[in-house]
């Protein structure tokens, strides 16, 4: 897998899983709506979403999963300008795809 697709998939899964659980807990028509332990579900799911994203993207790209992280690494000299552009573009596309799919599910 290329670094571009690793960042895309990692960011996609991060946003899809994290926002999916928030949607499931917050939206009134779902089974988890109004559950007093909902904050535990949300925080645990976001932690797992980060873990899943890192496991998927880590071996191929370092699992930045955020354009701000990639920018900081570029400013530090750890990424080239081409890598920064590729990573940031993949992350933005992955975030948009994960959020859009979540929107259509809920």
Model-derived segments and spans:
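Membrane-interface helix-loop junctions and terminal tails of multi-pass membrane proteins
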Residues: 1-106
């Amino acid at each position: 897998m290329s670094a571009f697709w690793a960042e895309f998939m990692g960011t996609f899964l991060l946003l899809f899983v994290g926002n999916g659980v928030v949607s499931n807990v917050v939206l009134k028509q779902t089974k988890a709506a109004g559950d007093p332990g909902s904050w535990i579900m949300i925080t645990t799911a976001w932690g797992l979403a980060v873990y899943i994203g890192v496991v998927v993207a880590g071996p191929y790209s370092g699992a930045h999963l955020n354009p701000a992280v990639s920018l900081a690494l570029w400013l530090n000299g750890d990424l080239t300008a081409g890598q920064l552009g590729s990573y940031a573009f993949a992350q933005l596309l992955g975030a948009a795809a994960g959020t859009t799919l979540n929107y259509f599910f809920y």
